[in-house]
């Protein structure tokens, strides 16, 4: 297969990536681009790629962070072998880093790279397993809302599993998960990697008021300040701030389309599954559904507020008693399993928060 080496720059760093044209016997099934982010976990990546392989998207963007040390190389090479088992007609772009950047800024870098080459794209991490309907769902709605500035992203993960009371296949919300999502270049081009809105007092005051009025996470602005001070772009806070500053809405499927299988001992963001509070464990065991097409589209673009209430309760935003209860539950579970290191870590974090010393890194 022909391969072309290209070079692209990110904030003064130059990285080589390749563009491969796969001409196999099976045709592409869905005309959409998919970005896959992975590192060194072949077992979970295999499950994600199996679904991508069934869906057969027309374009693939493959981003892999580089090794921290020699011990990472076995997993890194195993992951590369998995994602290169492509047996359908597909244009494949690869960006494999030579050094380790970590989740941040890798998330930001990979997505800016993919959206510089595609005007709309699906994003999947190596622990996010989609249903087959997810690809068709995203394709149809990426086209439908391509030029609608009110819509910021299309989500795949529904924290309700199935949202009651909605007579359509999706609805609109101002809260969302990044466990499987899609968006447009028009949105990514607005991402403010330098957090310049923090230099505008009126914008900061507006965001402060919105966070209070919506009972959003109270530490959001401090998180943005910490991320700016760290001098590297953090995708999640950049995405959320862009959505808030633009009064954007997300498309949410009425039925969940994603499984997250990332709650393992070696995961970056989550503690061991068995020591999670019960409600959070449920997020990792939800059923994913297949939709019936054609989709039933809502007539009006208006936020469905009951979902926001469910979402806030799931993450204990604006629910201090629920948060305290979960902290106690987590402490008891860690005691039960003898996870004293996690207990010390959690206590240290809470003490730092009480003293105003906690920083988001």
Regions found by a protein language model. Name each.
Residues 22-123, 128-361:
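Peripheral/terminal regions associated with large enzymatic or DNA-binding modules
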């Amino acid at each position: 297969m022909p391969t072309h080496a290209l070079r692209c720059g990110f904030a003064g760093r130059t990285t080589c990536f390749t563009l491969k044209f796969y001409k196999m016997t099976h045709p592409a099934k869905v005309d959409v681009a998919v970005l896959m982010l992975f590192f060194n976990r072949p077992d979970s990546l295999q499950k994600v790629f199996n679904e991508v392989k069934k869906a057969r998207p027309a374009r693939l963007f493959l981003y892999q962070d580089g090794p921290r040390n020699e011990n990472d190389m076995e997993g890194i090479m195993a992951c590369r072998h998995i994602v290169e088992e492509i047996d359908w007609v597909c244009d494949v772009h690869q960006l494999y880093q030579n050094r380790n950047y970590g989740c941040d800024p890798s998330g930001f870098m990979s997505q800016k790279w993919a959206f510089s080459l595609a005007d709309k794209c699906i994003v999947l991490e190596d622990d996010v397993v989609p249903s087959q309907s997810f690809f068709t769902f995203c394709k149809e709605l990426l086209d439908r809302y391509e030029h609608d500035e009110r819509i910021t992203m299309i989500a795949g993960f529904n924290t309700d599993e199935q949202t009651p009371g909605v007579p359509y296949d999706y609805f609109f919300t101002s809260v969302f998960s990044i466990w499987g999502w899609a968006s447009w270049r028009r949105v990514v081009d607005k991402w403010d990697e330098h957090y310049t809105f923090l230099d505008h007092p009126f914008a900061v005051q507006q965001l402060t008021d919105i966070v209070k009025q919506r009972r959003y996470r109270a530490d959001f602005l401090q998180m943005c300040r910490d991320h700016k001070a760290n001098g590297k772009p953090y995708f999640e806070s950049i995405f959320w701030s862009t959505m808030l500053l633009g009064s954007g809405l997300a498309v949410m499927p009425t039925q969940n389309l994603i499984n997250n299988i990332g709650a393992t001992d070696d995961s970056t963001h989550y503690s061991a599954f068995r020591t999670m509070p019960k409600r959070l464990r449920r997020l990792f065991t939800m059923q994913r559904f297949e939709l019936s097409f054609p989709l039933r589209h809502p007539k009006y673009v208006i936020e469905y507020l009951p979902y926001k209430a469910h979402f806030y309760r799931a993450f204990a935003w604006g629910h201090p008693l629920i948060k305290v209860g979960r902290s106690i539950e987590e402490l008891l579970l860690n005691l039960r399993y003898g996870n004293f290191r996690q207990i010390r870590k959690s206590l240290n974090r809470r003490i730092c928060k009480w003293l105003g010393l906690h920083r988001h890194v």
